[in-house]
């Protein structure tokens, strides 16, 4: 067994990728690569390797993509580096006690037990034939012992006229075009294709001027072996038969069947034990790698490495557009697409494009219906792991995301970010048609339809169209709703309040007010009676000074001062500052009245209307005048009444300047200027401005009719 001729360098254990090759790796392979390379470098440092930190290590530590530029020389493209692939795999899978078949000198193959430490594995493995170890560099004249030293000694990398490989088009120095052969037999192109398919990675490369010092035939055959991946062949230093192919057929068969690790849960197979172990953690939930800062656990070491950077304050990558900073260059690259609008990933099903591949993968689950993340509590499944995590907090009650301004907490980070805009006033979404800004992308989407007049939701029953799915669903209830619940006592039908209706027969009033002892049949009537909650009112409107004890009330009130009305009705064009207001308004068009009175069966479009209506049956009048003690069933009636004490008359006529205490009085008065007389007598055709005058006139006809009847009876 030969040992290494010369010191161990980082290039002897490094594997490089071009940008194209790097993009072909899946995320797990990239993480594994990062772990292995960083571990290899740490081993070298631990045994005394002392030199400038390689660029690839710097890139990996900073989270950058470690692929090399076209002009750089890739470490893995020498024959020894290909043998080092086995070395790296054994370091990664150090639990596997048996080493792979080792290269041997003079056509002899040795197989022996390897130790798990890096130094023992490396020193016991002969990487290249002894006959090609000692060479002089043609550029600098140095006498070098190892291929890695020979390759790295020259910085010029001048290229001479090359020969060309007829299989892949790569160019090499030397006259003889060598082939895979044994006893003159040439392997077919089909067999070469099979070798390409069983290769883990395709690694094309070029050699520089320094490689003229080596046997050109050996270099060219080493290039052909790049399509094979594993190195089961014997090394031979006897000239043209540099690689012996006697074991090729057996190796080819073993490679095509080389996925011995099968998952018993899902049946997926793996060629590497390390990947199989990582995959199993997806089923077991095992997360052995814990962050020592926040305690968060991960199933892969590479994922933990990336996570640790989130705790670092250093964010060297800054966006020139918006100033946002990132700790990884990859994150900056992805962020820049939000400004450029670049979306390189397209869905083959619907044509929708995305700026990140992960977003495309998640979107495609909408088409496939795949929901791989089930909740252990309720069995509900989700297409995203983050959605499952958010959902599970609804079972635990945990709210991790807290607003620093008002202290309100949320299950989801995205909900917190949206909420914080109510404090900052940020409106990042702009309409390209009119330039209006919105705080949520959903608001912008709804608004944009007002420009397009798009109404994609059509009712199959009546043909009516809607621009909102929610409005369409509410409208359908008009056609499908039936009174299917019959009271066994009186035969009355009630879809919504059958249980409450039964209590009316039992004369049971389960809802009692703790303040006055009054009882109610239904919870809605009880809620309407209860006094407002007492306590500190910490939210003050800076426009009118009004106080609120809940942020949601304050937010809704504040919009009454602003001109923002992002919610537009697709039917009549009326706009609203709150989505709930639009929701209620649309019932005017759909005819939906979901709130039913359990007493008389009357339906209402709003719950507040039902609550007020209930007071007719209960006789409740919760609003009392502090001046005279008169009580009212509605707050609006109390407000109007109070003006009789204060003398306030806020409604002024634009024509004559006369003022009124009620808006209805102003409306009636305005008819004297417009000449409108909406009330017409069916008897004589006379018209009136006021209903009261019309009613008085009607009495004249009724009295006249009574006199005629009296005369006829005489």
Swiss-Prot record:
A zinc finger (C2H2-type) spans 261-283, 289-311, 317-339, 345-367, 373-395, 401-423, 429-451, 457-479, 485-505, 511-533, 539-561, 567-589, 595-617, 623-645, 651-673, 679-701. Residues 8-79 form the KRAB domain. It comes from the Eukaryota. There is a cross-link at residues 97, 259, 315, 357, 534, 537 (Glycyl lysine isopeptide (Lys-Gly) (interchain with G-Cter in SUMO2)). Residues 171-260 are annotated as: Required for interaction with RB1. Residues 417-714 are annotated as: Interaction with AR. InterPro entries: KRAB, KRAB_dom_sf, Znf_C2H2_sf, Znf_C2H2_type. GO terms for biological process: negative regulation of DNA-templated transcription; regulation of DNA-templated transcription; regulation of transcription by RNA polymerase II. It is found in: Nucleus. Gene3D superfamilies: 6.10.140.140, Classic Zinc Finger. One of its GO terms (molecular function) is RNA polymerase II cis-regulatory region sequence-specific DNA binding. One of its GO terms (cellular component) is nucleus. The keyword rRNA processing does not apply. Its main location: nucleus. Expressed in bone, brain, heart, kidney, liver, lung, pancreas and placenta. PANTHER family: C2H2-TYPE DOMAIN-CONTAINING PROTEIN, ZINC FINGER AND SCAN DOMAIN-CONTAINING. Interacts with AR and RB1. May also interact with other nuclear hormone receptors such as NR3C1/GR. Belongs to the krueppel C2H2-type zinc-finger protein family. May repress E2F-dependent transcription. May promote AR-dependent transcription. This is RB-associated KRAB zinc finger protein. It comes from Homo sapiens (Human).
């Amino acid at each position: 067994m030969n040992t290494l001729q010369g010191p161990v360098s980082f290039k002897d254990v490094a594997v490089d990728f071009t940008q194209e090759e790097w993009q072909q790796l899946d995320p797990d392979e990239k993480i594994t690569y990062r772990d292995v390379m960083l571990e290899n470098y740490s081993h070298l440092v631990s045994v005394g390797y002392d030199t400038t930190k390689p660029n690839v290590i710097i890139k990996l530590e900073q989270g950058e993509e470690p692929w090399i530029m076209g002009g750089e020389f890739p470490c893995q493209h020498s024959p020894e580096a290909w043998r080092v692939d086995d070395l790296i795999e054994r370091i990664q899978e150090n639990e596997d006690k048996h080493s792979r078949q080792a290269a041997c000198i003079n056509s002899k193959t040795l197989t022996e037990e390897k130790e798990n430490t890096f130094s023992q594995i490396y020193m016991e493995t002969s990487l290249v034939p002894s006959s090609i170890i000692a060479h002089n560099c043609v550029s600098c004249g140095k006498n070098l012992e190892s291929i890695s030293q020979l390759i790295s000694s020259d910085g010029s990398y001048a290229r001479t006229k090359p020969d060309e490989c007829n299989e892949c088009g790569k160019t090499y120095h030397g006259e003889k075009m060598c082939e895979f052969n044994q006893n003159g037999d040439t392997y077919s192109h089909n067999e070469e294709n099979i070798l390409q398919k069983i290769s883990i990675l395709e690694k094309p490369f070029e050699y520089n001027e320094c490689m003229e010092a080596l046997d050109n035939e050996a270099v060219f055959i080493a290039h052909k072996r790049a399509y094979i991946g594993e190195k089961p062949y014997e090394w031979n230093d006897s000239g043209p038969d540099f690689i012996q192919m006697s074991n090729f057929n057996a190796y080819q068969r073993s490679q095509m069947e080389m996925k011995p690790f099968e998952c018993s849960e899902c049946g997926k197979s793996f060629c590497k034990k390390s990947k199989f172990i990582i995959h199993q953690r997806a089923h077991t939930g095992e997360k052995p790698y814990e962050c020592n800062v926040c305690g968060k656990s991960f199933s892969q070491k590479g994922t933990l490495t990336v996570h640790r950077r989130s705790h670092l304050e250093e964010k060297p990558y800054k966006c020139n557009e918006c100033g946002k900073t990132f700790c990884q260059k990859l994150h900056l690259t992805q962020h820049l697409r939000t400004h450029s609008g670049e979306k390189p990933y397209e869905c083959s099903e619907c044509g929708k494009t995305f700026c990140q591949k992960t977003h495309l993968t998640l979107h495609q689950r909408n088409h496939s219906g795949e929901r791989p993340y089930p909740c252990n509590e309720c069995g509900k499944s989700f297409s995203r792991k983050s959605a499952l995590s958010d959902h599970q907090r609804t079972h635990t009650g945990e709210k991790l995301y807290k607003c620093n301004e008002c202290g309100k907490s949320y299950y989801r980070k995205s909900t917190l970010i949206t909420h914080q805009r109510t404090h900052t006033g940020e409106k990042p979404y702009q309409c390209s048609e009119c330039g209006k800004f919105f705080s949520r992308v959903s608001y912008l989407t709804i608004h944009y339809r007002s420009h397009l007049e798009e109404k994609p939701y059509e009712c199959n029953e009546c043909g009516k169209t809607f621009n909102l799915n929610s409005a369409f669903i509410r409208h359908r209830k008009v056609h499908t709703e039936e009174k299917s619940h019959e009271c066994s006592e009186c035969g009355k039908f009630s879809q919504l309040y059958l249980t409450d209706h039964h209590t009316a027969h039992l004369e049971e009033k389960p809802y009692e007010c703790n303040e006055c002892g009054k009882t109610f049949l239904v919870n809605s009537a009880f809620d309407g009676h209860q006094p407002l909650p007492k306590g500190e009112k910490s939210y003050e409107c800076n426009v009118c000074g009004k106080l609120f004890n809940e942020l949601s009330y304050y937010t809704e009130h504040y919009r009454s001062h602003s001109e923002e009305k992002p919610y537009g009705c697709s039917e009549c064009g009326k706009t609203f500052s709150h989505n709930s207001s639009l929701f209620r308004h649309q019932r005017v068009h759909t005819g939906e009245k979901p709130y039913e009175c359990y007493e008389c069966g009357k339906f209402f479009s709003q719950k507040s209307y039902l609550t007020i209506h209930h007071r007719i049956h209960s006789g409740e009048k919760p609003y009392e005048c502090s001046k005279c003690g008169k009580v009212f069933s509605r707050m609006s009636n109390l407000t109007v009444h109070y003006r009789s004490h204060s003398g306030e008359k806020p409604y002024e006529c634009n024509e004559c300047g006369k003022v009124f205490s009620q808006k209805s009085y102003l409306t009636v008065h305005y008819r004297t200027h417009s000449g409108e007389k909406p009330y017409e007598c069916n008897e004589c055709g006379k018209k009136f401005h006021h209903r009261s005058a019309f009613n008085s006139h009607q009495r004249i006809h009724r009295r006249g009719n009574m006199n005629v009847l009296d005369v006829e009876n005489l």
